[in-house]
Amino acid sequence: DILAAFRVTPQPGVPPEEAGAAVAAESSTGTWTTVWTDGLTSLDRYKGRCYDIEPVPGEDNQYICYVAYPLDLFEEGSVTNMFTSIVGNVFGFKALRALRLEDLRIPVAYVKTFQGPPHGIQVERDKLNKYGRPLLGCTIKPKLGLSAKNYGRAVYECLRGGLDFTKDDENVNSQPFMRWRDRFLFCAEAIYKAQAETGEIKGHYLNATAGTCEEMMKRAIFARELGVPIVMHDYLTGGFTANTSLAHYCRDNGLLLHIHRAMHAVIDRQKNHGIHFRVLAKALRMSGGDHIHSGTVVGKLEGERDITLGFVDLLRDDYIEKDRSRGIYFTQDWVSLPGVLPVASGGIHVWHMPALTEIFGDDSVLQFGGGTLGHPWGNAPGAVANRVALEACVQARNEGRDLAREGNEIIREASKWSPELAAACEVWKEIKFEFQAMDTLDK
């Protein structure tokens, strides 16, 4: 069975048992009345079952309801069908004040029907020939308005300065100021020029997201013809059907696939209604993607540390034990489905580097947009500052130093022999994003 943990807030007067049973029925075989065709099938075989209910600590009228769905209810290899069944209609139920899908346990038999990420963490490292450290990226800014040639120039400067990747912003598709084909050509030129100068393999996340699947595939095919290593997709706005199609193409044609989660906070930010991001992350690993944005813990975007590390493990590891202290409701066995690199991006700069290295470890992408392009000396010095800070943090960690306690000192020491890093440290020494997270663990 697929197991689901729902956070249920019933309307006043509705018992939790009735609410849990209604969720199980509506998301499987039930309807609002008895129908004569019920007698033509075995409802006992196909119906969802609410098998446990527990009150949420510290909340008045809120419960975690556990529902089991027989595997026969789901089409093999289809995240689209899985979500249509489990969350398709039930969230509009009048008997419920609010409903949130907190977690899913995907059984081994169902996991094996999915290709998953096009390549996974180890294959990506082998393709890039980069080991023993997080990868470094940068989102090109301003996100909208640059011509293709100026955009390509910014890509070149960042890659030449020491970054591994640069990135299209999620809303860069094919607008009047910069059509996709022009952008792809100038970015490919920038990649090859930077590779020739640095001797390192470089990449730019070329956003293939489009209004139709056919147009999306046309862009991915052109990227492959240019010989670039990676393309990008906005998987929630583009949809799981399009994403899975693109992931299959990427595996067949040797392209890495970067995934942006644009629109996720509409779905996952409210604590009592929607779908938790750990579910969207699991779904992405099944649908296919080699990177996905996962929050930063320390930057400008939502994300409590324990919760973030919980779904980071669900993205990367092969077997994850149930751990309610990190929001993981079920033990998950991925049976060697390739892992996904979490991408930390959003309001981060060089002073965050020790914390990011300590929190996310080597198998991650640390992505600095404003934290690269906002450097007072330009894009290439901004990239140099980030690369020096990262190398210093990795070296200090490997020497046994405590990044959590000594992080600022490590950055200061490195800045003494890197004027680019020293300038970055001065610019961003006062920048902090100290707001309470909306989505917190139940105490």
Curated annotation (Swiss-Prot):
It comes from the Eukaryota. The disulfide bond which can form in the large chain dimeric partners within the hexadecamer appears to be associated with oxidative stress and protein turnover. Belongs to the RuBisCO large chain family. Type I subfamily. Its EC number is 4.1.1.39. Keywords: Calvin cycle, Carbon dioxide fixation, Chloroplast, Disulfide bond, Lyase, Magnesium, Metal-binding, Monooxygenase, Oxidoreductase, Photorespiration, Photosynthesis, Plastid. Pfam families: RuBisCO_large, RuBisCO_large_N. One of its GO terms (biological process) is reductive pentose-phosphate cycle. RuBisCO catalyzes two reactions: the carboxylation of D-ribulose 1,5-bisphosphate, the primary event in carbon dioxide fixation, as well as the oxidative fragmentation of the pentose substrate in the photorespiration process. Both reactions occur simultaneously and in competition at the same active site. It is found in: Plastid, Chloroplast. Binds 1 Mg(2+) ion per subunit. HAMAP family: RuBisCO_L_type1. Substrate binds at N89, T139, K143, R261, H293, S345. The basic functional RuBisCO is composed of a large chain homodimer in a 'head-to-tail' conformation. In form I RuBisCO this homodimer is arranged in a barrel-like tetramer with the small subunits forming a tetrameric 'cap' on each end of the 'barrel'. Mg(2+) binds at K167, D169, E170. The keyword Chloroplast applies. The active site is at K141 (proton acceptor), H260 (proton acceptor). InterPro entries: RuBisCO, RuBisCo_large_chain_AS, RuBisCO_lsu_C, RuBisCO_lsu_C_sf, RuBisCO_lsu_fd_N, RuBisCO_lsu_N_sf, RuBisCO_lsuI. Heterohexadecamer of 8 large chains and 8 small chains; disulfide-linked. The disulfide link is formed within the large subunit homodimers. NCBIfam families: PRK04208.1 (NF003252). This is Ribulose bisphosphate carboxylase large chain. The record marks K300 as: Transition state stabilizer.
